[in-house]
Structures are given as structure tokens and as C-alpha cells.
Amino acid sequence: MIDKDGNTLSFVEEHRIRRTLRTIRSRVRRLIVRAALDALEDGVGSVNLVAPGDVYEELFSFIGAGTLFTEMQYGFVRPVSIDDFEEVEALIVRGQTEGHLLPRTPEQIAQILPSCWGYRIGDEHLAGICSLLTEPYRRDRAGEITAMYTLTRFQGEGVAAVLVREILKEARARRLKYLFACTSDDLVAALFSRLGFERARASDVPAAKWRGYDPSRIASLSILRAHLG
């Protein structure tokens, strides 16, 4: 399924299916969507709608091609477990390859895995991840949101926003003074701003953040900070 702008809808909850039915002109397409809704009403947990030629991409790639129909909000955020490490590492490497994440060595990735959180689609795969890094900043009682990445097929579905909101809750529960994030992506910076983060200077975050950091790169970063007091 696609939205009014021609973008694929990765997942659609039941209440949105009913609205969608009213806008579909094709009788065949309306019948297909109606069948998915009927299945949900009959107790099926979820229905995946995908074109026959896209089945392989849907099942065996990170990109995906179909639309997942669910009765209610299907994703949830939780800290990753050791059983998730391999999947999380694969997403971080993918994000680095695509240029969305700062390059890290395998050893550096291994160090942040225990601090990662994931947005999981039901009992299936991870749609997005991020890390709440606190150990380097414990003296400052601060935390950094880093290694945030959302799979291409779920971008625009609010996954990153849900992750950040959950991290904010966790940070408050840990009585951190503030959270910060650094990004060179204007869209990511805008997301943090919408969620209450404010623009900051390099000196407004722990000095430990910049140890070994390329000084020339700092100037290109948007540094955002959320006070939690």
C-alpha cells in the first residue's frame, strides 16, 4: 500500500485500515484490504500484504516491500538483550555503510551494544535502534543518544521519535541531569528539536565526548541537549 505521496506504508493499524478503505477506488484493491481487515477481526495477529514479485525482498532483506496490517500499534521499545547483539550490530554496520552513522571499529561497536535500545516489530525484526550511552559521562550525570538508525522501509513511520521518547523516560528514571545528541543530519536535528532538545555548544556537553574526536568535524555537527531536571 502507498500513501497519497506514493510512499509505501510499512505498517497500518486497524483503525487506519477503515479510513483507507473509504479512499480506495479500485474494487479489487478494496476487496484485498477488506480481506486483511476481516482477518484481523477474526483474531489473526497481523497480515502482511506484498506483491508476488516482492516476496523475496520482503522476507529476506532489510529493505522490505510490503505493508503490515495489525490490530493495534505493533512496535515496542525495550533494551536489547545479548540475543539481539548480532542483529543490532548488523544494523549499526548497515547505518555506517549508508553514511548515517559515525564509523566505528568492531571493538567500538561491541562496547556500545549493551547500552542499545531497539524498536521491535512484534516478535519479528528490529525496525530501529539507538544507544543510551552513560558510562563515559557518569561524573556529569549525563547521557548521550548515539548510534540511532532506522531501517529505510520504516523511515517516516515515527520509529525514531518513539525511541527518543523512551530514552528520555529512561534517563529521567536514572536521574540524569541531561541528555545530548550530535548529528550532521538536519532532519535528525529537527527531530530532536521537536522532542524538546535545544541547540548547544561543544562546551555544553561533557569534555569526555570530545577526547580523540576530530576537531574539524565538530564544527559540522548540530549539538542538541535536553535538560531533565
Feature annotation, model-predicted:
Residues 185-213:
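Conserved active-site alpha-helix within GNAT-family acetyltransferase domains
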Residues 150, 156-169:
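Conserved acetyl-CoA-binding loop-helix of GNAT-fold acetyltransferases
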Residues 1-111, 156:
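C-terminal catalytic "cap/lid" subdomain
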Residues 45, 177, 198:
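Short acidic/polar active-site loop segments enriched in Thr and Asp
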Residues 103-150:
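A conserved beta-strand-loop-helix scaffold within acyl/acetyltransferase catalytic domains
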Residues 171-184:
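Conserved GNAT acetyl-CoA-binding A-motif
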